[in-house]
Every structure is written in structure tokens, then in C-alpha cells.
Amino acid sequence: MLDINLFREEKGNNPEIIRESQRRRFASVEIVDEIIKLDKEWRQRQFEVDSFRKEFNKLNKQVAQLKIKKEDASEIIQQTEKNKQDSTAKEAEVREAYAALKAKLEQVGNLVHDSVPVDKDEANNLVIKLWGEKRFSTPGLKLKNHVDLVELLGIADTKRGAEIAGARGFFLKGDGLMLNQALINFGLTFLKKRGFTGLQPPFFMRKDVMAKCAQLAQFDEELYKVTGEGDDKYLIATAEQPLCAYHIDEWIHPTELPLRYAGYSSCFRKEAGSHGRDTLGIFRVHQFEKIEQFCITGPNENASWEMLDEMMKNSEDFYQALKLPYQIVSIVSGALNDAAAKKYDLEAWFPSSETFRELVSCSNCTDYQARRLEIRYGQKKSNEQTKQYVHMLNSTLTATERTICCILENYQREDGVDIPEVLQPFMGGETFLPFKAKPVVADTKGKKSKA
């Protein structure tokens, strides 16, 4: 969430900056004034509580003095009792006022960076880079889609997966499992060489911690709830969530920064808002593996923006190593999630549909997440009036099943699929996956038959 001081003109800040950011997000501008009003109400109640406490201390001293003089203090004692009651009631008002303020504050997104293209429609994301040579079907070879290629190679069993796990369930099988592990091992090795520390996080999180890492809408549309003895928990939708909370309630000394983590995990998503989109094959599924870059920097100068460029370069170098054509887009302001000040997507080329599709999202969340999680910058000082928070960034390296789909389409041949050279050492030296089933083609009557 944002720093409440940004809403306070008396602190030398300009709330109009927040209003403008909200306009860029196509979100409520009125909420800024609502927060300013709630903040004033909360501080007024807090002032009243402080006044009660000062009065209580004053009365207590009077009681002590009267007792020393062995004089009657009963009237003053009655006043202290009334003060306690009034103070308790006012403290309840303070808690209520703060809860209302915090609830509103959490609805305001991060400040949108000036370089973000302002638009509401993702169709207008700004293309900033193209890499690689796009492949197209030729008269001699009609390129197949990833759904058909998975079936022809026999690398996943979606029929039995759906029978056992429900819609979009699947088994990775044989070379499919090996290819998935090859991507994981290549990705982790790739990041280790770039100074990243590997972390495999828990696959579920406590609700109170998840609430500090995920938006409210994600609980309904994305997260699976795990019930059992004790507190409710939620399955992670990305390693970003547990990595985000890894340093919760800690102070991080400047000498420790930057921190670079390579999170590897299975991920679980309900995908409630994606009915009818990519429901076949293994492109958009409820359970998948992902390697996530997660980095923490200091809040000063351009440290986090330089890290954003570094993380984006890592992703580009990874897909260049796989020789998959891609484009980089800057996401429009209206499509940013609340935490992101700026976000890039890397979209790779899928030849069968002749379109680019998202494989990577890379965001700078500045101090928005760290403030909620109380991950502070520097070292604790007893006399410090203001706290600084670290900046946190996240980026996909590879969601492996989705990357496999892209590899299959770009590396297909008439009789199978080549294995990218960088993955071959992780595949026992295999260089080619032959089709195990015969391709399906249309016969002269328009019906499908085996070739």
C-alpha cells in the first residue's frame, strides 16, 4: 500500500500526484479525498486519546501527592476512573477509525511511473522491442498447434488427467516430463550463474500472510483454499507470493542489498475468469511449474529501476538461448495490477496462430508490497521518526508448461520436434522427439482421418 504521508499536504506532499495516478489507472479519484478525510478523523481521535493519557498521568501525580500528605484523594481517584473509561471508549474509536482508513488505503494502487503508456485497453500495450525471426506455415509444411503436437508426441495425457483432476487436469508423460525438468534445470542453472539464490517455497500460505501479498480479487478468481485443522490456508498461484513474504517484519541492511532469489514451485490457479480461453492442451492449466525471479533493492536513487532492466534482460537472454522469437511490450496503465508501478511482458511467437502470447511478466512494485509486510530498509533506530521500506520486483523466468507449448510450435518438423540445443544436456543428449501417433488430416469428404 502507499505511504499515508503522501496524502498529507502539511507534510509537504501533494495528493494531486496520487489523483493523477488513479486517473491513469482509470480508477476512483474520489477515494483520495475519502482517505484524506478518514486520516484526519483518525488523527483527531488519536489526539484525543493522547490527551486522555496526559490527563490521567496528571491526575495520578495529584493522587500520589495527596497520599504523601495523607489527605483525601477520593475525588481525584474517581476522576481517574472516569478518565480510564472515557479513554477505553476513545481507543475503540481510534481502532475503528484506523481500520476504516487502512481498508480504503489498500484500495489505492501504486503510483504509476511516468513512462507507462496511458490507456485502458491491453490491445494498446506499447511494443518496445522485437527479437528473432518469426516462423510461418509453408506450402510444404502446415504448422500444427501445440494442442495437436502434445497429442502426436504423446508427452501428456489430458484425457486421464481430466477424469482424475477435473477440467484442465493432465499427466506429463515420458519425454514431456523430461522436457519439463530440462526447462526447470536449465532455468535454475541459468539464474544461479547470474547471482541468484534458489528457493523452493511452501506451496501454501496462511490467510493473513497471503492477504498481504495478493489482491482481494485474487482470492475469488485465482486462489485455491485449503481447509483442515487450524487456520485456513491458500495454495500459491506463483512463487512470488511466498518470496514476497520471505523477509516479513525484518530490517534489511543496505550492505545485504540487492537480494536476488530464484523461486521454483508448483503453482495453482483456479483461472475463474478465463472460461473458454485456451482450455485445451497444457497452455492454461490449474497446476503448473514456474521459475520466478524475485529481487529486493534499496529505495534510493534508481536502484529498483536498474534492477527491472536487469531482470528483463535475464528473461530476454533466456528466451534468446532457447531461440524463441518474442516481442517486449510495456503494459498500459489501466491494465496494471495494484502493486505494479510499471510492468513489461515478454510475448513469444506461436506460429500456428501467428500471434505473440505472454510468457513473462516483469514488474517493479517499488515499496508498495514491502510496506504492508513491514520489510524495512536499514537498521532499527530507537529515535527514528520515519521508516524507509525496500523495493521489491518480480518477473517470470519460465512457466514451464507454457514454454513447452511455444517450443513445440517453433521447433516442429514433419515427423516430430527438435529439442532446443541448450536443453539437450538436460535430456540425456536427446536431440529430437518423434511423433508417436499419426497426424490427423482432412479426407476428401471433409471428415478427419489418420494420415
From Swiss-Prot:
It catalyses: tRNA(Ser) + L-serine + ATP = L-seryl-tRNA(Ser) + AMP + diphosphate + H(+). GO terms for cellular component: cytosol; plastid. Keywords: Aminoacyl-tRNA synthetase, ATP-binding, Cytoplasm, Disulfide bond, Ligase, Nucleotide-binding, Protein biosynthesis. InterPro entries: aa-tRNA-synt_IIb, aa-tRNA-synth_II, aa-tRNA-synth_II/BPL/LPL, Ser-tRNA-ligase_type_1, Ser-tRNA-synth_1_N, SerRS_1_N_sf, SerRS_core, tRNA-bd_arm. Gene3D superfamilies: Bira Bifunctional Protein, Domain 2, Serine-tRNA synthetase, tRNA binding domain. Its EC number is 6.1.1.11. Pfam families: Seryl_tRNA_N, tRNA-synt_2b. L-serine binds at residues 238-240, 292, 396. The keyword Cell inner membrane does not apply. Its main location: cytoplasm. Disulfide bonds join 213-244. It is an enzyme of class 6 (ligase). GO terms for biological process: cytoplasmic translation; seryl-tRNA aminoacylation. Belongs to the class-II aminoacyl-tRNA synthetase family. Type-1 seryl-tRNA synthetase subfamily. Catalyzes the attachment of serine to tRNA(Ser) in a two-step reaction: serine is first activated by ATP to form Ser-AMP and then transferred to the acceptor end of tRNA(Ser). Consists of two distinct domains, a catalytic core and a N-terminal extension that is involved in tRNA binding. Homodimer. The tRNA molecule binds across the dimer. NCBIfam families: serS. This is Serine--tRNA ligase, cytoplasmic.
